[in-house]
């Protein structure tokens, strides 16, 4: 036989592909079986020589799949080799992954526990072994395609006929042990500790074969290969002796399992040897896992599902969404707790193949981008969570605060927002705008609750520092530069630090913080508050290099030469927009941004005379309020918009009015007047309208209606624009319309692949909470970018939430009767000073305010999609989701050799159900 013929013969012996076994398909050089066997031979030729590669192929042809042989038995089948050479050849073939060895006696034919070699099945078996070889799969990348295809082709069109328990095919989900109810009649095989104790002393670990495979194929989902695959029993010893893994202790294995749960990875055990043996425990990520694909792609949960199903308690659930984000099956989504006018929403259950014809039209080919990525049911969920750009678990932390769980509330907030104290002072409060309670009386004082929670942490002896939660267990050593130390840049650094990086923030100013310290007055947010939250970032390993302007002091190219592999540009909009009218160059005219910078730096402590502020947004309010504190004269704001059109947060506008700022609506500056080079007044004209019929900014003026306002100072706060200097010099990154940096809307990647952008220079002028959201997305993209083979989009949670229909709900009477919204007290000693005069809520106010929450949202589990992994239970801090043992038949484990004995009867019963269902439908 030729080599190709030998490979084809061996491939047919091992394969589970029905079309090959039935003779419909041949094993040709482009067939996956051929690719796998040939890569093993090529690896052997490199490590040993061509003769050894040829010889191990001949030896393999004398073996039968999954029939173990001792060295004596192999010698009888291969008399052409002397004993010493045969032993060397068996070591070589074992290292190649085609053959495995063990000492077990499960078949009763090895009472003395002699070493025996076995020709493995492809999956699970030799394909994974070839992948975890530290050299082989990278040397011969076609190995990855072999693994991927052999985990797919034998199952396509078959999985719908597989009974509960998996029929000895592939892998089987085993739940998080602490999630198994104590009162359930669980079996020992449903507990990971049972298997680890059974094999204690023979436990090892290897890199994940699936993660490595997807990396090589360029389809990684950000779950970078690390040591996640635990080998047990003789397989662990085999891996150690062939350099496929190394030994670990029982305790180390338990630590890996805990880290896997922290990451949201699913525990699975091998399911091809019956109830008395497994050889591996995998910790699987749905974006890359071939085993989970067997149930998720084909929509046939029997291939994976454990005996358990998750159930959510609607009374306890607060729609934090953490279970949804990590559900590998997409079984949990956020819905609503409030009834509609027609009654409670009845959430649908996914169709199953038990009584339905199942073809590709029933598959979910997009499962990697749906499971854990689609957050809400079509009817929506809590409006506060949906409206927040960072999608903080608002309903959740309000519940915790009301129960006095302040530290837990802070931890929950910090999963999505690194700056709760900052946001507690200056947030845009999108959540309060959306709050369902606002349709009854007033929205919850959500921001005040968050501020209180953050202050408890700031007062604590030991601040909460979020722990690293790396997808590889270890820190990453890739160097990442954050250009700009504002909220977007620091948020990116924060989430990268959690992922295991040590990013470096380059900030051109003397201290980090961006507009938080330079553009917002201290009576709105104390600089000590900003510093305290930045200090937490330092403790997380973020480095700040201040007084360094990238593009001037050092270039991106120079940083690349220093080893930086990715850049996050978040330089904001640093220059104020101009009026472009006569007199703008007079002394006394200043941009609001420059004015606030000088005030915050302590360089400007007094103004003389009356002040006119031009602008109608929040920044203009800040400027006007700051000016009031520096002058004995009057402060008047003039803006284009009518009062109801002003782009201000109502609270901010009201605070300005309370301070004494006079707001004059529908006026536009025409010219600034002066004498001797100094401002003496300003001429304004009537603004008739601000936007045209399409909503585009197109102000219309009546120049015949004018007023002249005497003043000594004109502060212009009409917006900001970008000033990039040379930060992007020498790169392909470019601006759109000369303003914002062009980027992908999902990944925030610029036209230069290693440059990502965020904050105002990406989105235009927005708020701190918006910047935080873009910082998180930047971190997600950068992590994927700097790790080879990871895509920027596969299994990316785009964090899209839909709010419930507030026009179709029935509000709970007992909640509506709760007290009125708590008012924010004012410290009279701080009024019109540079200190924040707002008094933080008391604990009593917190409890009262939390009681007003209507608890709109909840998680809803589809039991037909749930695979019973229990990961959801590890993410819930409210005791709201639990596993129940409702599918005991799913714990039936049988040897792979008996799979057709299980599939046949089940398939026959299923066919009867399909016929009955079809007949019933025809009668209708």
Per-segment meaning from a language model:
Residues 585-608, 672, 692-765:
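FAD-site-proximal beta/loop scaffold in flavoenzymes
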